[in-house]
């Protein structure tokens, strides 16, 4: 029997931009509880974004995350001994979580530059609808499209 659903944690807005989205990015980048370092990385990346685009960095940041958010994903569902990949719509909080996770993971996987620059580069690519994070979203959508025949197994 399943227990009740966990209450989502309330994330406070960040001190510089007053945005919850920035705090979530900082928390995702943070390692070993070193929040001040993570904040420097994120704020530095946002500054780089505003320099490169000539627009408000926080707006570019928000749009980049919006562009990466997936609409559908596949989840495994076991039916009669077979496991099907069933396409399901992604709930809003998970959309944001996945977008942030993909951007940070891709930025981390790049080599040879400081994290600020790697993160700014990936956010800029996402803003322009290019780059690995957008490809990841497209792959997830393709997988859901390929398994559309199993959509009637949704729960």
From Swiss-Prot:
Any one GO cellular component localisation term in the record: small ribosomal subunit
GO annotation, biological process: translation
Keywords, alphabetical: Ribonucleoprotein, Ribosomal protein, RNA-binding, rRNA-binding, tRNA-binding
Assembly and oligomerization: Part of the 30S ribosomal subunit. Contacts proteins S9 and S11.
Family matches, as PANTHER family: RIBOSOMAL PROTEIN S7 (PTHR11205)
Function (record text): One of the primary rRNA binding proteins, it binds directly to 16S rRNA where it nucleates assembly of the head domain of the 30S subunit. Is located at the subunit interface close to the decoding center, probably blocks exit of the E-site tRNA.
Originating organism: Fervidobacterium nodosum (strain ATCC 35602 / DSM 5306 / Rt17-B1)
Alphabetical list of InterPro entries matching this protein: Ribosomal_uS7, Ribosomal_uS7_bac/org-type, Ribosomal_uS7_CS, Ribosomal_uS7_dom, Ribosomal_uS7_dom_sf
One Pfam family it belongs to: Ribosomal_S7
NCBIfam families: rpsG_bact
Gene, per the UniProt record: rpsG
TM spans (from-to): none
Superkingdom in the source lineage: Bacteria
An MF annotation (GO) of this entry: rRNA binding
Annotated CDD domains: uS7_Bacteria
Record-stated family: Belongs to the universal ribosomal protein uS7 family.
Protein name: Small ribosomal subunit protein uS7
């Amino acid at each position: 029997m399943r227990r009740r659903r966990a209450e989502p944690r309330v994330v406070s807005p960040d001190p510089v931009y007053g945005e919850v989205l920035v705090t979530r990015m900082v928390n995702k980048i943070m390692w070993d509880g070193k929040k001040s370092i993570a904040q420097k990385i994120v704020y530095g990346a946002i500054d780089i974004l505003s320099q490169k685009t000539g627009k408000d960095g926080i707006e570019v940041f928000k749009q980049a995350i919006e562009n990466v958010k997936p609409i559908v994903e596949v989840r495994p569902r076991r039916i009669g001994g077979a496991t099907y990949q069933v396409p399901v719509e992604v709930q809003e909080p998970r959309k944001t979580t996945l977008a942030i996770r993909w951007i940070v993971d891709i930025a981390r996987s790049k080599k040879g530059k400081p994290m600020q620059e790697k993160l700014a580069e990936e956010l800029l690519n996402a803003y322009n609808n290019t780059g690995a994070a957008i490809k990841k979203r497209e792959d997830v959508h393709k997988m859901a499209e390929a398994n559309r025949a199993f959509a009637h197994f949704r729960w």
